[in-house]
Swiss-Prot record:
Stretches in topological domain Cytoplasmic: 223-246
GO CC annotation, single: extracellular space
Signal peptide annotation: 1-26
Function: Induces a strong chemotactic response. Induces calcium mobilization. Binds to CXCR6/Bonzo. Also acts as a scavenger receptor on macrophages, which specifically binds to OxLDL (oxidized low density lipoprotein), suggesting that it may be involved in pathophysiology such as atherogenesis.
GO biological process: cellular response to lipopolysaccharide; positive regulation of cell growth; positive regulation of cell migration; receptor-mediated endocytosis; response to tumor necrosis factor; response to type II interferon; T cell chemotaxis
GO molecular function: chemokine activity; chemokine receptor binding; low-density lipoprotein particle receptor activity; scavenger receptor activity
Record-given protein name: C-X-C motif chemokine 16
Gene: Cxcl16
Subcellular compartments: Membrane
Length: 246
């Protein structure tokens, strides 16, 4: 008789089955069993800041594989050790939807949020509104963003992002903008009316010319037909045969 599977063989078989059917994280859109890597970064390797920023920006999904984590980008995949600091930061950043493109919101949009929040207290100077709420939201956003995102915000700050408008600027400029828009509408309405008066005679003259031409052609055809009929009648009378006398 054949011997059955022993406990060790059964345990090894179950372990292989568990590795093959290891489920992925559904929130990150990972595919079960897709642990192939285009590039593997060894543990302890110093990653350039530009490479890390590129992964943050184009990260679409990640998959938890045995002993490492696979990050899926737009055109390739990058793998790193699950215990590495940069790997854990990327996973936390993607789970909080602060980086990557898999959420329908790019990292480029997220990294400009602190500048937008800092404009609120400056634009609200001179108004009786409470400034504690913008400060609280600013501190909350700074605390939720990772350290790499804060450094990127400092590096990529543009001069136009820090410009502030004086209070009441929109209220004063709005009537002038409405008046200018109204004047432009009036000019656009007057221009077609003035230009349409002269070309209005063109189709009328063309129509009259066509009617005159058709009338002359019909008169010519009728005159020719009548003259032809008269000539044929005269010929018939001229060549009328005479019956012989008996």
């Amino acid at each position: 008789m054949r011997r059955g599977f022993g406990p060790l063989s059964l345990a090894f078989f179950l372990f292989l089955l568990a590795l093959l059917t290891l489920p992925g994280d559904g929130n990150q859109g990972s595919v079960a069993g897709s642990c192939s890597c285009d590039r593997t970064i060894s543990s302890g390797t110093q990653i350039p800041q530009g490479t890390l920023d590129h992964i943050r920006k184009y990260l679409k999904a990640f998959h938890r594989c045995p002993f490492f984590i696979r990050f899926q980008l737009q055109s390739k995949s990058v793998c790193g050790g699950s215990q590495d600091q940069w790997v854990r930061e990327l996973v936390d950043c993607f789970e909080r939807k602060e980086c990557g493109t898999g959420h329908g919101k790019s990292f480029h949009h997220q990294k400009h949020l602190p500048q937008a929040s800092t404009q609120t207290p400056e634009a609200a100077e001179g108004t009786p509104s409470d400034t504690s709420t913008p400060a609280h939201s600013q501190s909350t956003q700074h605390s939720t963003l990772p350290s790499g995102a804060l450094s990127l915000n400092k590096e990529h700050t543009q001069p136009w992002e820090m410009t502030t408008l004086p209070s009441g600027y929109g209220l004063e400029a709005r009537p002038e903008a409405e008046a200018n828009e109204k004047q432009q509408d009036d000019r656009q309405q007057e221009a077609p009316g003035a230009g349409a008066s002269t070309p209005a005679w063109v189709p009328v003259l063309s129509l009259l010319a066509i009617v005159f031409f058709l009338t002359a052609a019909m008169a010519y055809v009728l005159c020719n037909r009548r003259a032809t009929q008269q000539n044929s009648a005269g010929l018939q009378l001229w060549y009328t045969p005479v019956e012989p006398r008996p």
